[in-house]
């Protein structure tokens, strides 16, 4: 039996996941993080993107995170997300439309603030589409 630890993924609206996992993969402020059992304690910001949860027996779940905080303690990991949406609950057409609008905004932006905001919106839309794609593959 593989080693596991307890994971809680919580958003402002609801608890998205609580249970034993073998590992997770998430994008922290300094880059991609793989958290395995026995990981050193850590507290870091999470960038908008996905969390890949590998549950017991290798089953995977993907959740979109709009950002938040990751806390790693011995035997327990907590993700406090600004917004969290399960892959199967994301709307692909809506994400595609958000991506298109952000791309238009980038091409027509004139100021640094407009460009930065449009880039952030584009990154969120691309992350949502990636979660949708991976969720479909896992099913």
Curated annotation (Swiss-Prot):
**Where in or outside the cell is it found?**
Cell inner membrane
Entry keyword set: ATP synthesis, Cell inner membrane, Cell membrane, CF(1), Hydrogen ion transport, Ion transport, Membrane, Transport
Pfam entry (one): ATP-synt_DE
Q: Does the keyword Cell inner membrane apply?
A: yes
> Per its UniProt record, what Gene3D superfamilies does this chain match?
ATP synthase delta/epsilon subunit, C-terminal domain, F0F1 ATP synthase delta/epsilon subunit, N-terminal
Say which domain of life the source belongs to: Bacteria
Q: Could you tell me the membrane topology recorded for this protein?
A: Peripheral membrane protein
Q: Matching SUPFAM superfamilies, A to Z? A: Epsilon subunit of F1F0-ATP synthase C-terminal domain (SSF46604), Epsilon subunit of F1F0-ATP synthase N-terminal domain (SSF51344)
Q: Which GO terms describe its cellular component?
A: plasma membrane; proton-transporting ATP synthase complex
One Gene Ontology term from the biological process aspect of the record: proton motive force-driven plasma membrane ATP synthesis
Gene Ontology molecular functions? ATP binding; proton-transporting ATP synthase activity, rotational mechanism
Subunit-structure text: F-type ATPases have 2 components, CF(1) - the catalytic core - and CF(0) - the membrane proton channel. CF(1) has five subunits: alpha(3), beta(3), gamma(1), delta(1), epsilon(1). CF(0) has three main subunits: a, b and c.
Entry similarity comment: Belongs to the ATPase epsilon chain family.
What is the role of the protein in this entry?
A: Produces ATP from ADP in the presence of a proton gradient across the membrane.
Q: Which HAMAP family does the UniProt entry name for this protein? A: ATP_synth_epsil_bac (MF_00530)
Protein name (record): ATP synthase epsilon chain
- Source organism per UniProt: Escherichia coli (strain K12)
